[in-house]
Amino acid sequence: LRIDLITNVSHDLKTPLTSMVGYMELMRKEELNDTVRDYLDVITDKAAKLKEMIESLFSLAKASSGNVEFHMETLELNRLVEQIYGDMEDKIADSGLEIVTSLTEQDTGLVSDNMYLYRICQNLLENALKYSAKGTRVFVKTFYRSGIMGDQLCLEVTNTAGYPMDFQKEDIIERFARADQSRTTEGNGLGLAIVSTYASALGGAFDIDIDCDQFKAKVTFPITEKEETETCEEDGLS
């Protein structure tokens, strides 16, 4: 019932918001003084953030309900990470943070949905940029690990928090829960909840490790027998 309510409310909010954005675009075509134009810029920016939040909420509710159709294809995790770097180049530069990357030289092919996997990786990096202490480094790492559940491909993002992390790791992935309880930065609290929900829906897992001021977020995806066979064939081992 709660998921249905969120889905319906999110959908109903889209129509008036779209109308508001349309009227703001019409206003831009008018002759406005600098003060009014500055106000319009602020309203437009806030409307864009509201639209992003509504779309995230709608997408999260849909994925939580299991009512989503994935378009599975073979993807390269390393290549996706590099693509996100390019797409977020301005945000990374504006953050003033140093991104330290360590991508495995092994094949990072996996069968997944490009849009959802992209959003997972993007949210992890955005979360690190948003909540890191100034002048610190963000570590992005891809690697393989083996265990009783078989081989897994992992993406790990580690940052130094710019605030006291006086919370339990279970709290951080709750919908609308935010690590920064003082609300000193912008955000709607959906970022890591989306990562957790999407990863689970794609057959993976999401975990967080907190050690003093170090915040480590990790997603893992199982490597299927088909993927392992394809990797062996590419390496000339079959």
List each model region and its residues.
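Short conserved segment of the HATPase_c
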Residues: 164-177
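Conserved micro-motifs of the catalytic ATP-binding
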Residues: 65-70, 109-112
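Short alpha-helical segment of the dimerization/phosphotransfer core of two-component systems
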Residues: 45-50
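Glycine-rich ATP-binding loops of the HATPase_c
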Residues: 203-212
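Conserved catalytic submotifs in the C-terminal HATPase_c
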Residues: 71-74, 93, 98-108
